[in-house]
Amino acid sequence: MLSTQFQPCDARRAFPCFDEPALKASFELSIEIPDDQTALCNTPEKETTPSSRPGGSAGWKWKVVQFEKSLVMSTYLYTWAVGDFGYVEAETERRYSGRRLPVRVYTTKGLEEQGRYALEHAWKIIDLLSEVRTSSQPPQDHDADHLQAVPNRMLFSSCCT
């Protein structure tokens, strides 16, 4: 697994930026990864296309994963991960813009059931936060589609940022 941890000021090691908490920006990520891997980000996946990269002697196939534009945030909050992930999924009980919000907990492939406890609470927390805010929209963005959790790191989609 490859993942980012930009706190307190390491975003500048990954991409050119003003890496100060008071300076904020929105981000768009495209990442090229082996076809059998999964890429995760703070924002929902926009599209996946085959890569033109040659497979080399190993014959690997590659893909390009593009993610939606993020909300305005500090650089240290932006994060992504690439790995051999599996997930468990549920939906919120509450409806947002007429639909239930899918919630996913990602784990190392084969360990999905170990994410079940987190999943059972994640959708409840999303609904609770929306009740506290007295809104029919999930926090921040009604287009957000899932909460993602990976080992030792939490990646919050824009619905939880």
For each feature predicted by the language model, list its residue ranges.
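Hydrophobic helix-coil surface modules that form long, contiguous segments used
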Residues: 3-11, 16-161
